[in-house]
Amino acid sequence: INSLLASAKKVINSKLSNKQKKVMFNEGTEKPYSSELLNEKRKGFYHCANCGNKLFASNSKFDSGTGWPSFSEALPGAFKTKTDYSFGMERVEYHCAKCGAHHGHVFNDGPRESGKRFCSNGLCLIFKPD
C-alpha cells in the first residue's frame, strides 16, 4: 500500500478542503459528530471525495453510536488495508483502492451480518442519492 499512497499524493483533487487533505493524505481523523453525513438516511452510494470511486451502498450504513458514519460492508474491491500501530494500539486502516486516500479504520464489532464496522471520516465521502 505504501506505493499506492505515494502515487495518490500526486493526484490530490484540487477541490478538496485543507481539512479533507489532512484526513485523507496525512491519515488524520475528523472530530466525532461533525460530519453532515452522519444522519444521512437516503438511498444511494458513498464515493471517495478525492477520486469519486464508489465505496459503500447506503443499505450498509448503520448507527454505531461512535459519532462517525459507519458501514457494515464495503463494495467489492473498494479498499486496501494496512495495519496502524499509532496511539499504542493495533488497528486496521482502510484506504481507497483507486487513489490511496485514507478513509478510516475497520473493526470487528459491527452488525451480525458481517461483523465489520467501517468507521469512516465523513470528510472523505461524497454521498450521491439514487
Model-derived segments and their meaning:
Residues 5-130:
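A short Gly-Trp-Pro
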